[in-house]
Amino acid sequence: FGSDSISNIFSSGKSLEAIALASLVSQGLLAYDKKVSEYWPEFGAAGKGELTVADLMRHEAGLAAFKVSIDPKDLLRENIKQNKIGAIIESHPQSFRENGSEREYHAVTRGWIVNELFRRIDPEGRTIGQFISEDVNGPLGADIFIGVDETHIPRVVPVTPLPIRYQFKESLKPSIMGRRIERNIFQTASRL
C-alpha cells in the first residue's frame, strides 16, 4: 500500500453520486423534486412513475435489491452505455420492507440508478465515472475513480474480507451488546 494506491471507497462513493447530481442541478438540468421518469421515461415502468429524484437520493426508491443476477461485464462502461443495467432497472418493480417503511439503504443499487439518470441528463451522455475524471480530477488534481481502466489496475489494493467466523459470531450478537453487523445471518437468509 502506497501513496498512489487505489482503494475501494464503498459507500463513500455515494458522496460522488451526490456531487454529480448537484452539478446537474447547478446547471439547471435537474431538480430534486421532479420525477425520475421526467428525465428517463422508461424508468417509470413497473409502477415507478411517481418516484422523485429526492426519493431516490433518500434511499426511498424501493429498489434496494434486484431479484435478478447482474453479469459483472454489464458494469463495464461500454455496456452501461448500451443500457445493460438501465434495462434491468427499467423493468424492475419497487419492493418495500415488510414493516411498511419506504426507506431502505440502497447499498449498491442506488449508484447504478443514479448513474443511469446522470448519463441521460448530462449533455455529453457521460457516466458519473467520466464526469469525476473530467470535471473533478482534472481541475482539482484529484485521483478518484468510479471504474478503473486497465492502466490503473496495478494500483488497485485488493479488498480483504473479514473472516467468516468473525462475521458469523458478530451477526449473532444482540444489538444491545454492540452487534457490528446490521442483520444476523438468519435475517439475511430470510431476505434471499
Regions found by a protein language model. Give the residues of each.
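Active-site-proximal loop and beta-strand segments within enzyme catalytic domains
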Residues: F1-V108, E116, F186
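Structured segments of extracytoplasmic/periplasmic soluble domains
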Residues: H59, I88, R120, E134, ...
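Short, well-ordered surface patches within globular domains
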Residues: A54, G129, S133-E134
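Penicillin-binding protein/beta-lactamase superfamily catalytic region
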Residues: E134, E150-L192
